[in-house]
């Protein structure tokens, strides 16, 4: 039962119909139309968001059993799939009076990937990589499903885009097949231009989707439909079964991209599965921002806004990772006596178990990203990205210390006062104490002293033989974004670090002045003053805190 709050307005758009619960209202606007179904724009009154209303006329479906089977297959699959690269299903029902079958899915603002690519002729190779990686992640999920799922009709017409987010998702699963055990599929079905050679032999497995994926990437790169030089399906069949690639394949100017597409279009015995293709160098980012999923930005902002109010994050299906199994909130508290900041993390799992973790945060030496990486490793957090956690921490610190964001280079923190990485010898590692209410022991977490990160280099240099070997946070912790260690990139990173250090000099001096002022105030108030030495005791750092413990 939903309570409707309405307001009088002449500009409001009336619903053509609503679902049985009254939650979803359909408009007349048609988003797309196929041979079997029509997709309308609709509105979800509970979440306050636009959705896609898929409608099928049952009279048309019942003319033959095949369309009915396709419809059932699509809805049944969507109800059981849950992945960020697969179109999200909401609900379905049959309208007996109108003789229609209806189901609600998420809305895509920019249509299909084919329409989107034809609309925007100039697309950077980094965008192609991002789209390809999202699609391949979706295929890896489908093929790794239990039992495995084959799409069988993957093409740019069946991939949908949210252009303002850089997000693509796989849809139209009406032709998908579920492989039971180790059996292969045995029906010829799909779109000829995207069908693998073995499909015509009626004996194939999930690798046919990899072939179709390669054709999708080919279309993304060239903007041309595969085998557009052919005038009929018979010509396409002859080329495909003889192993001849489309003419557009030879138009690819990017060498690595052409090699990658060729890998996807190999014969089935040499074709790699989705999980292995994800590790291909073509999809690896040379810059950590190359493949940054732009659609995650609204998620981070939403998390920050909720965490700022100390609210446990609710994972709405429209904004969060559907594979996530825990809720997390981070709140900060400042000690008014010594101005030490303590952060409290609450983690709620799917079984209702709550973990409370408290630890100090030193605004002069700690960075949100370092702390987030520690948390991910030591608390064994697998369903949260370190950057998301870092954004929550940064938001809390900024609320407690408003000027901190300006005096700190945000998540990409640079410390001024040490040499470059190549000049650094052995450095002392700091440790932080995470205390969890759900465990009987405290876990010390080591952090590297060197905060020297650049925008292109988040992996610490582990070649230094003098580096301490007892640090728990080793290089494997940082491998959430690839980097290239050639001489040119190393020189560029050194230049970036030097520039950032120079820019942070003024901010660093501001921090020093602020600290000196606070020490003077505390001294006059009689806080932190040692009468034996007639000196002011410094503000305790994370290391001092641990030693006292």
Curated annotation (Swiss-Prot):
Its EC number is 2.7.11.1. Keywords: ATP-binding, Kinase, Nucleotide-binding, Phosphoprotein, Serine/threonine-protein kinase, Transferase. GO terms for molecular function: ATP binding; protein histidine kinase binding; protein kinase activity; protein serine kinase activity; protein serine/threonine kinase activity. Residues 25-283 form the Protein kinase domain. The active site is at 172 (proton acceptor). Gene3D superfamilies: Phosphatidylinositol 3-kinase Catalytic Subunit, Chain A, domain 1 (3.10.20.90), Phosphorylase Kinase, domain 1 (3.30.200.20), Transferase(Phosphotransferase) domain 1 (1.10.510.10). Regulates flowering time by modulating the photoperiod pathway. This is Probable serine/threonine-protein kinase WNK5. The gene is WNK5.
